[in-house]
């Protein structure tokens, strides 16, 4: 019997055999490894960073140049609009000393009219200047009144800061670099190293002492009632204005009240124009970082602020002039510092009833168009000063530019109803050099008369005058 056996078939390969790489493929891969393709570099990042660096450097240099030009009086003056430059050319500056331990500063004064007539002295509030009263003093001058408008220190064209030498005041990075450079110029590059070798310690205290002794920094002028009294007194004495009719606008009442109390004999009358302890312009916003830069950098924002709180009748050019004066030469810092020194507890009723002041003729000129609250404030002032004449004008809280003629009419009429002022004129003392010439001439003249010679005398005593004289204007 035959046995049939089945042979197992070889398993079929399911996956097809891989193709063998061709020689050409090996050649390609070898050539790729040997000669890799250079990757193209993107130039965008380089030019991007280059542009950023150049832009930042440009901004820094422009900022530094603008900062230096703002602190340079000549550059600042040349950048002013024609109206401000014309106003400055019509006035003059006077040296005054606010504090005995400080250097004298310059105060700007604008005036109009004959000096031989009644004198009206106008004092502005914080945030304003004599520029706001330029039309008003011209109108008063045309009515036969000598009118004088003063820029209080820290405002307008008067000095707004003073140089402080020495001290340990905080300074910026650029100023500190200049100090180090100046110290190296004076002591040499290796001075500190030599001191360290000799003493075994870095002369840190001596370096700080040297830096502080030579440090020059600008300090904003802070003006309170005491400082204002000194300034008013020196300006009035220097120009020989006393007695004066005093016109106080806005916050000038609190600033000038001390001088009036101490010198009531030199005051013929007082006129208050929308006077309050706090200024109409909200100066506190100029102390808020970010907001202050925007308000003073652009006319639009400052115009809206003035229109909302102070005056809706002022022209854009006049508002912009006030913005420029506040912005330049540390004006903002000075006004904000003076704002902090205002006497907010000032009692106008007590002041008006004090000895000396209660006998001064007074007039209150108040806005009837500002707001109901402001009209109520005017009535309160009128009750506090019952002897004062009370009239209203058709302007806002800053009426001196849009209603200058109306205000001038009120002031001139009020002044004309009062008795004529008696002005005391103190003649200049004879200079020492001239006094010597007088003595020599007198000795020679006595000698000549002794010998019978007659000579004409040079009239020094008539030119300078001896003693004091009373004149009536």
From Swiss-Prot:
Q: InterPro entries under this entry? A: AB_hydrolase_1, AB_hydrolase_fold
Q: What happens when the gene is disrupted?
A: Plants show reduced gravitropism, auxin-resistant root growth and AUX1 accumulation in the endoplasmic reticulum.
Q: What's its job? A: Required for the auxin influx facilitator AUX1 polar trafficking and its asymmetric localization within the plasma membrane. Not involved in the PIN proteins localization.
Please give the GO cellular component terms listed in this UniProt entry: endoplasmic reticulum; endoplasmic reticulum membrane; mitochondrion; nucleus; plant-type vacuole
Where does the source fall among the domains of life? Eukaryota
**Organism, scientific name:** Arabidopsis thaliana
Q: How does it sit in the membrane?
A: Single-pass membrane protein
Which residue spans adopt a coiled-coil conformation according to this UniProt entry? none
- Which ranges are annotated Polar residues under compositional bias? 29-38
- This one is known as Protein AUXIN RESPONSE 4
Q: Which gene encodes it?
A: AXR4
Region listing for Disordered, in residue ranges: 1-38
Chief subcellular site? Answer: endoplasmic reticulum
What ranges does the record list as Acidic residues composition bias?
1-10
| Sequence intervals crossing the membrane | 44-64
Its keywords, alphabetically, are:
Endoplasmic reticulum, Membrane, Transmembrane, Transmembrane helix
- What is known about the tissue distribution of this protein? Most abundant in root tissue, lesser amounts in rosette leaves, stems and flowers and very little in mature siliques.
């Amino acid at each position: 019997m035959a046995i049939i056996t089945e042979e197992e078939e070889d398993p079929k390969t399911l996956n097809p055999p891989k193709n063998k790489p061709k020689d050409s493929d090996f050649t390609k891969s070898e050539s790729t490894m040997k000669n890799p393709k250079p990757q193209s570099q993107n130039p965008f990042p380089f030019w991007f960073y280059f542009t950023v660096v150049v832009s930042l450097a440009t901004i820094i240099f422009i900022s530094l140049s603008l900062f230096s030009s703002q602190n340079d009086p000549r550059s600042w003056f040349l950048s002013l609009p024609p109206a401000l430059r014309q106003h400055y050319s019509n006035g003059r500056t006077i040296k005054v000393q606010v504090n005995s331990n400080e250097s004298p500063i310059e105060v700007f004064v604008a005036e109009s009219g004959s000096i031989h007539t009644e004198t009206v002295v106008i004092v502005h509030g914080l945030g304003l200047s004599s520029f706001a009263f330029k039309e008003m003093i011209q109108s008063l001058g045309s009515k036969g009144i000598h009118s004088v408008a003063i820029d209080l220190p820290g405002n307008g064209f008067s000095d707004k800061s003073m140089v402080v030498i020495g001290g340990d005041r905080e300074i910026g990075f650029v100023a500190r670099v200049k100090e180090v450079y100046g110290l190296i110029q004076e002591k040499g590059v290796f001075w500190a190293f030599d001191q360290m070798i000799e003493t075994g310690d870095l002369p840190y205290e001596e370096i700080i002492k040297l830096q502080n002794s030579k440090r020059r920094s600008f300090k904003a002028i802070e003006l309170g009632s005491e400082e204002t009294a000194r300034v008013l007194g020196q300006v009035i004495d220097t120009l020989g204005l006393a007695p004066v009719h005093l016109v106080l606008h806005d916050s000038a009442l609190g600033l000038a009240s001390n001088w009036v109390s101490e010198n009531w004999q030199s005051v013929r009358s007082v006129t208050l124009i929308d006077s309050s302890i706090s200024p109409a312009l909200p100066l506190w916003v100029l102390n808020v970082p970010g907001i202050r830069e925007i308000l003073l950098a652009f006319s639009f924002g400052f115009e809206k602020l003035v229109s909302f709180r102070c005056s809706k009748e002022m022209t854009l050019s006049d508002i912009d002039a006030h913005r420029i004066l506040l912005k330049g030469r540390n004006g903002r810092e000075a006004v904000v510092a003076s704002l902090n020194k205002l006497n907010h507890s000032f009692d106008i009723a007590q002041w008006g009833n004090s000895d000396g002041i209660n006998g001064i003729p007074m007039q209150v000129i108040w806005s009837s168009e500002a707001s109901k609250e402001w009209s109520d404030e005017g009535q309160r002032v009128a009750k506090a000063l019952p002897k004062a004449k009370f009239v209203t004008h058709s302007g806002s809280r800053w009426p001196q530019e849009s209603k200058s003629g109306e205000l001038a009419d009120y002031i001139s009429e009020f002044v004309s109803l009062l008795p004529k002022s008696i002005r005391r004129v103190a003649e200049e003392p004879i200079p020492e050099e001239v006094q010597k010439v007088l003595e020599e001439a007198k000795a020679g003249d006595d000698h000549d008369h002794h010998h019978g010679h007659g000579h004409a005398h040079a009239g020094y005593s008539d030119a300078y005058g001896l003693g004091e004289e009373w004149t009536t204007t």
